[in-house]
């Protein structure tokens, strides 16, 4: 069955050992790193707008515990702001309406179960005057759909958030279909022709521009966006950390082709719908459109192995780290890979991938480059 983004682009479902729920520590660490940026943007909404009902949307929410961590954090920031700035009573706090958005293939059933647990936990605090006085009323809804389309009415959202999503494209470049690969790569490499590399870059420019235009229509005046996603540290498109990460996956798939477990034709037609941009590329599009004021942009790094918190250049156990990296990537890539090559290869593929990552980490400790962008809807004078 051919891969379809709307159907197949979602994280591994359920609560099993290979699920996204059990393997989303990198995203959790990124959320911790961008906490101050989220707080600044949320406070800006509170200070300049503070509506009776604040609408907050998490785009590409997935289904793990990080989604509810975001809800909890925004609620905490708003409650703290209202207490410090206004000393508001509970009945004067703004109501919070959260929309959790992802593609229809997302594990919304698991997400709704987490929401139910969250609501029950919040209910247990009712009757505790000290806690309840600080807790704004909070309502949470799921919203299936692509954020590369309009998903909200005009000027209805106060704060947009997205974590580890905007490296995903709406599709792999259309012009790559039917082209003959000189190599069996699935993402940008130095062996790829300049014209093919340019197609990946153009797809990013098209998608990111569309995303910003859509959100501009949906944000209220003064509304904020905090976007955190995988990028690269350098302007050179061939030096990105993602090139190594996905290059090792391509090598693992090639080895399965050699073993007769994967059809060569299927690998020849497979490209990842991904592009990891530089800060310069992101800034250029924001400035070119002129729809948003840029509050903040920065790059931070996270070790490939989410359980390696060390800051040095040495990997203490490359085999264990290789397995950890493979689990994280499988939780993200499994549905896409399975739709193209079949589920039966998954265990063997990611076993081979773990081995190759371990060998890579023996020679070079590699980190994800993560971009954080905070922008505000600009007032355009006609």
Curated annotation (Swiss-Prot):
GO molecular function: S-adenosylmethionine-dependent methyltransferase activity
Record keyword Metal-binding present: yes
Pfam families for the chain: Methyltransf_7
GO biological process, one term: methylation
Binding site for S-adenosyl-L-homocysteine: 20, 61, 66, 102-103, 146-147
Keyword Plastid attached: no
Record Gene3D superfamilies: Methyltransferase, alpha-helical capping domain, Vaccinia Virus protein VP39
Family of this protein: Belongs to the methyltransferase superfamily. Type-7 methyltransferase family. SABATH subfamily.
Protein name: Inactive anthranilate O-methyltransferase 1
């Amino acid at each position: 069955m051919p891969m379809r983004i709307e159907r197949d682009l979602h994280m591994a479902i359920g609560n099993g050992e290979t699920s996204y729920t059990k393997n989303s520590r990198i995203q959790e660490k990124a959320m911790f790193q961008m906490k101050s940026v989220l707080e600044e943007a949320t406070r800006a909404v509170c200070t300049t707008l503070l509506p009776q009902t604040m609408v907050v949307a998490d785009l590409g929410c997935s289904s793990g515990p990080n989604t509810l961590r975001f809800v909890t954090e925004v609620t905490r920031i708003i409650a703290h702001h209202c207490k410090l700035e206004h000393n508001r009573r509970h009945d004067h706090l703004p109501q919070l309406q959260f929309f959790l958005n992802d593609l229809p293939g997302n594990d919304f059933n698991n997400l709704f179960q987490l929401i139910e647990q969250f609501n029950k936990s919040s209910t247990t605090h009712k009757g505790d005057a000290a806690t309840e006085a600080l807790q704004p009323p909070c309502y949470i809804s799921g919203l299936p759909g692509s954020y590369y389309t309009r998903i909200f009415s005009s000027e209805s959202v106060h704060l947009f958030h997205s974590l580890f999503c905007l490296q995903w494209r709406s599709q792999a470049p259309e012009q790559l279909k039917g082209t003959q690969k000189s190599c069996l790569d699935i993402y940008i490499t130095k062996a790829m022709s300049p014209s093919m590399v340019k197609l990946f870059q153009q797809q990013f420019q098209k998608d990111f521009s569309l995303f910003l235009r859509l959100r501009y229509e949906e944000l209220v005046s003064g509304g904020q966006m905090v976007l955190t996603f995988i990028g690269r540290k350098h302007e050179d498109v061939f030096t990105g950390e993602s090139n190594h990460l996905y290059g090792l996956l391509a090598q693992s798939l090639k080895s399965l082709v050699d073993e007769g477990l994967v059809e060569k034709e299927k690998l020849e037609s497979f490209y990842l719908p991904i592009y990891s941009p530089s800060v310069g590329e992101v800034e250029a599009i924001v400035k070119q459109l002129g729809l948003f004021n840029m509050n903040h942009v920065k790059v931070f790094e996270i070790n490939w192995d989410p359980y390696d918190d060390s800051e040095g250049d040495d990997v203490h156990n490359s085999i264990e780290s290789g397995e950890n990296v493979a689990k994280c990537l499988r939780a993200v890539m499994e549905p896409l890979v399975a739709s193209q090559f079949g589920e039966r290869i998954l265990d063997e593929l990611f076993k081979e991938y773990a081995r190759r990552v371990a060998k890579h980490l023996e020679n070079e400790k590699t980190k994800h480059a993560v971009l954080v962008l905070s922008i505000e809807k600009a007032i355009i004078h006609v």
